[in-house]
Amino acid sequence: KWPELETSLIDQDLENIFEKIKTIISLANSARMKAKIKRRWPVTEMAICSILDKETLVQSNNNNNTRKYYDYDHNQFDTELSKNDISEILKNQLNVHSYKVKQIHTSNTVEKVLEMINAHLPVLPLISIIRKNVAPQVKSDIGKVISEFEKIDKVDVLYTLKTDKKFRLFYNKASSFSSSSSSSFIDLYEKDLEISFSVKEGYVYAEKENLMIFMSTNRDQNLITQGLVRDLARNLQQLRKEKSYNPTEILSTAYIADLEKDEVSSLSLHTTDLTYLVRVQSIVLSEEKKEDIEYKIIEIDGREISISIN
């Protein structure tokens, strides 16, 4: 008889968390591809941002009759990822030293960009005038209007749009009867502006549905060395397979040659990790090949390195 599903044993909350984690990992991998950072290479930090539509939340709260959107716990998403030891699992899967979780509530682009700024995410607002919407109102002064708008602090524009639903822009209007000009203004609404954001230098991001990932692309020497350790371990593991060694057998020595002097020094701090990953008793690092050792030449990031194992 086939076993029957015991639904009472299913932890639906835990299932939902892992579904969310799958999406997070997929987005993180997309961000890595943009930055050309391999999955094996550790990165210093990531920010995971969950976007919640206000209307959806209000409808949900009306159905539950429990709380309004502005009472929503901003740390709930972080709590979900922290319980049941999920945090360490996610950190390992993302291959990141640390991550933070943010949650923003938004109903339009203005609020989305503002919320990201207020959440201290690495973004900069991008706002420009939609010429075809504004030109009919200011006619020949469109150039002056655009020029004046470029001088304005874009965060101030966002706050004003959120509170007043419009932004009043003052500019010098050309006179039809003389060379002088007079002060004038135009009220700009969200429909008159193209609003988006860019990611600050040193970061890359990926977005899907209601999730965004911001990943630091800055890699110091320690992170670069850790990435090299992962690459070398993978190639030495492959060499073990090619030589048909028993996967559980602890071999004598792994050799890594054609290294730079500083690489020998930095990798020597990670020999414990390498011996564990490759299952050998010792690691020999050198700038030049050792005599009487048969090496295999591999390529890592466009350069040749020689490895051997026995």
List PLM regions with ranges.
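Feature 926 captures the class I aminoacyl-tRNA synthetase adenylation module centered on the KMSKS loop
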Residues: 1-310
